[in-house]
Amino acid sequence: MNSNQNNDIKTKHHFPLLLALALTMGVFAAGSEELVISPLLPDLAKAFSSDVSVLALSISIYGVMIFIGAPLLVPLGDKYSRELSLLAGLMIFIIGTVICALAQNIFFFFLGRALSGLAAGAFVPTAYAVVGDRVPYTYRGKVMGLIVSSWSLALIFGVPLGSFIGGVLHWRWTFWIFALMGVLVVLLILLEMRRHAQHKNSGKEEIEEPAGTFRDALKVPRVPVYITITFCNMIGFYGMYSFLGTYLQDVFTGGNTAAGLFIMIYGIGFSMSVITGKIADRIGKMRSLLIALGVISVLLACLPYAPASMFLLIASLFIWGLMQSLTVTLLSTILSDCSERHRGKVMVFYSLASNLAVTLGSALMGPVYVAYGYAAVGLICAAITVLGFVLSVFAYKKYGKLEQKADQSLSQ
C-alpha cells in the first residue's frame, strides 16, 4: 500500500465533486471537438474553397499532435504540479479553438487544430493522473468511470450538438462554444486549486521528490504489463470497431441510419462506466479486469455472427460497450495508482499505447476485412484480446495481494 492510499484512509468519505466535474467536462470538450469535425467537413470545405479530403487532414493533424503533446507537457505535472499541466493544456485548447473559429483560410484552421490536438495530448493523461493524486482510493473507479464515460457522451451528445449548432447558426459557433466550455473548465480548476491549497495548508507539509525519467516510470512494478494489456485491448477494440459500421451496412438494408442506431446501442453501454466503475471499486479492480477482458474476448469472436438474431445483436453491442468502458476505466485507474512519483509519465505511456492502437487497429485489420471478411477480423481481434486476458491473469497472480491489502486497510 502506497502513501497515497494511506492518505485515502483518512479522506475516503469525501467525494471530490468539483474535481470530478472539472475533469469530466474537460475531457468531454476535448472529445467533442476531436469528433465533431466529421459532420462539419462539407461546410468547412465550402468555407475554405477546398476539398473534403483536404479538410480531413485536420483529423490526422489532431492525432499527430496528441502524440507530441503527451510527452511534451504532461511531465510538467510530475516536475511542478498537475494543475500547471492541466491549465497549460486548457489554455492551448482555448487558443487553438478560437483560432479555428476565427480562421479565414485553411492554414490557420490547421494551426488551430494542431494546437487543440497538442492540448488534448496534455490534458487527458494529466486528468487521469490527477484522479490518482486527489481522489480517495475508494472513489477512484467511480471518478475514472465518469471521465471515461465523457468520451461516450461526446460521441452521443457532443458531436450531434456541435453539428446541430453548425447547421442552425454557423460552423464557427461550434468552436466558440467549445472555447467557452474550456474557459468554464479553467474556472473550475482554479476553484479546485484554491480548495486544495487550503486543505494542504491545514495539513502536514508534503516532501517533494525528484520527478524521475520516462525510463524510471517503466521500471515501476505493474506498469509494463498493464501498458501491454492496454495496447492489446485497444488494438482489439479499434480493429473491430473501425469496420463495425461498414459490416452492419452490408448486413442490413437501412444503410447509414440502421448502422448508426446499432452503434448508438454500443455507446449507451459504454456510457454505463460510472455504474460499472462503482461496482469494480467494491469487488476489486484487478479481479474485475479479468472478467471484462474474458467477456470481450468471447464477444469479439462471436459478434460477426450476432446479426442472425436482432436480440442477440443488440445484447452483444450493449454488453461490448459495457465491458469495454469498464476495461478502460480499470486500466487507467490501476496504472494511475502504480506510482505517485511517476504518475504523470505512466499515464503518458497509457495515452500513447491507446493512440498507437487506434492507428494500428484500423490499418492492420483493413486488408483482413477486405480479403477475408468481418469474421476473420473478429477472430484476430479476439486472439489479441485473449493475450491481454492472459497477461491480466499473470498480473493478478503476481500483484493481486497489493490491491487486497489496500482494500482491507480502507475497510477498517
Swiss-Prot record:
GO MF annotations, alphabetized: transmembrane transporter activity
Keyword Metal-binding: no
Taxon lineage: Bacteria, Bacillati, Bacillota, Bacilli, Bacillales
SUPFAM superfamilies: MFS general substrate transporter (SSF103473)
Residues that span the membrane, as ranges: 17-37, 54-74, 91-111, 112-132, 146-166, 173-193, 225-245, 257-277, 299-319, 346-366, 375-395
InterPro entries from the UniProt entry: MFS, MFS_dom, MFS_Efflux_Transporters, MFS_trans_sf
Protein name: Uncharacterized MFS-type transporter YwfA
Compartments in which it is found: Cell membrane
Family affiliation: Belongs to the major facilitator superfamily.
GO cellular component, one term: plasma membrane
Principal location class: membrane
